[in-house]
Amino acid sequence: LVSASLLFSVFSSPVFSNPKVLKVGAIPDQNQDVLDKRFNLFSKELSKQLDVEVKYIPVINYVAAVTGFRTKDLDLVWFGGLSGVQARLQTPNSIVIAQRDIDKEFKSVFIVNKNLELKPISNIKGLKKLKNLRFTFGSENSTSGRLMPEYFLNQAGVEIKHFKGKKAGFSGSHDATIALVNSGAFDAGALNKQVWENNLKNNPKRTSNLELFWITPEYVDYHWVAQGDLENRFGEGFTKELKSVILNLDIKQKSHKQILDMFNAKRFIKAESKQYKNIEEIGRKLNKIR
């Protein structure tokens, strides 16, 4: 859990007392440098089109993102499937704004260290080969790095107690999972498919000792969630305008393409809370939602 003093230090900047600043947040699922570049660029575009001040506020972990949204210290947050469900359940009248084109059919990957000489598997039953290995997830509250991988492992009859030491690691982010398995600190891990593919393409040294073991079936994942009372601060029609700006980011425009590329997307599309019902059900089953 995040301590009250830590949250106070994160959300005590003067920007939080200014009702005319739209505060953007995001789960810290990757290296902070990547996140800073992506969300500062996104915030700048929002500010330009909405004609309001927009500020990106980094948070230290997934719990802080959910808590910051619940306490209304964050107005618009880029959540994963699970963290978004958690945030919306804790924040009455919150609104699902949009998702990327890739989020309605998202996937995770399981990776292994090449020294294991494990061949890729073709179906879920092969996950049993991961028993008795040192295995790491990403963040404890990650959809693609923990919730869905654990769900698929369970479907194959593999529980956390079956890993070496009767426990699993939690790296904290997808990038960290790659680094830990590549170094041999862990034998295997699970992460976001897009982050895996980006590292294969752009950071070959970081993946030089890794083998793709399995790609999961599709599920719904990331989405933008906004507070339900933004119009009280920014005026009538603001939420509709905010949604329109995000949905109309156009890959044919240079500045928009730069943003969309950083989100690994061609466009943002409409999304509804009911799409995440299955994520909520799995979250409850795995005790990530109570």
Regions found by a protein language model. Give the residues of each.
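Short beta-strand->loop
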Residues: 93-103, 163-167, 200-219
